[in-house]
Amino acid sequence: MTTESNSESNSESNTGPIKPTTTQTGTPVASDEHSLTVGTDGVAALHDRYLVEKLAQFNRERIPERIVHAKGGGAHGVFEVTGDVSAYTRAAVFQPGTSTETLQRFSSVAGEQGSPDTWRDVRGFSVKFYTTEGNYDIVGNNTPVFFIRDGIKFPDFIHSQKRLPGSGLRDATMQWDFWTLSPESAHQVTYLMGDRGLPRSWREMPGFGSHTYQWINAAGERFWVKYHFASNQGNVEMEGSEAELIAGADADYYRRDLHDAIEAGNFPSWTVSVQIMPYEDAKTYRFNPFDLTKVWPHADYPLIEVGVHTLNRNPQNFFAEIEQAAFSPANFVPGIAASPDKMLMARIFSYPDAARYRVGTNYAELPVNAPHAAPVNNYSQDGAGRHHFNAPEAPNYAPNSLGGPVADPLLAGEGSWENDGELLRAAAVLRSEDSDFGQAGTLYRDVFDDAAKARFLDTITGAISGVQRPEVTERAIWYWTSVDATLGAALRANLATWAEADMLAEASAQYSE
């Protein structure tokens, strides 16, 4: 096709005047289709700066994918306060009548960028609130617990869930080897292997902050808090066979579902509630309330409604607004703080550090990550990609006598808690109900109905049947027996039946040959 005919086609398809193609520096270019060559069949000229620019830019279009939660999607929205929790926190975002712009990202945990959305996995559920006091992020999942309780194990856990370094293949043996040697994982693995591991869509699943956080009210009183996001579309799951079919037919099934729903005006929403624990209760509660592998019973700490979170706008550019988005549990606002949760402590460091590596030193200046309703005043400067800077006469150090920003000493004690003891490496002191398997057993026996239990048994049998080391298989049977004795016995019988069927199939195949 000639340049002229291509121009006519463009003219017909655009409503406004045709804009000339330019280089990155704004100068017009001669052709989008032909390199500068010595004759029509000759070599390309190195001084064809537009060719060089296009190829160089193309080579750099991708940034490192997230080491976890790589595959995902998201949208913009609004959070509206419908309840009154001002007695517990002074955070502006949670005051009655407040409306706050938000960004949400959903994701899977273990899969890479191109992995199918419907693989069995925990789903990420992260919300950024652009509050008048700065950005506040809740970086959670669609389950209220996690696989481990100490961040020092996180790299090992993720390695075990991804791929073998030799073959580059995912491996059931190393997954179950890690899980069964880390019994604190039992509660989360029960969620994962149950129906919660295969939601129908991101719209039809709940979300949780998972960690315990601290709220501080206007009087300085402290409380411990957990976040819950209940889907107003209901919680809907899919069968394993259906998930496998969809994985082969549409790897972007969840991403497409969310985009199409919002595009059609079918805005998904979640009712946001919290559990509140009085500060002093944590010292004597029957299990460690900061343990990320445990839930707080609603009978002890009932849900209190805070507001409604609605997604109502798709990104205009997926890369700029979703892929470059950086969420961090370190992003607190006045009235909200951390807790002694060891996993939370590790994530407070690792998330912004990952963003600096993945997006760049000045990732927080990008529009999607910068505050939308609060000013930024600090003394940071320079670094790759720096866009914003202070006035030339402004000081770049503190303290100064030139009218630069001044820290607020009244915030110094906010978010604190009392602790003592020697510096050591050890697990938390066990309390009366600090069992790794107790809540997993309760979930299986009291929450799963008979049909869900049957599906669960089939799922773990299939997953464990791929284990190649007998000692890991035996340990997996012990693991589930510790969750529930009846379940463990059924699993052993199921595995024996599956193994016998495999042997018969193998013998039949050999006989046929």
Segments (PLM) and residue ranges:
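Active-site-adjacent core segments of small-molecule enzymes
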Residues: 2-513
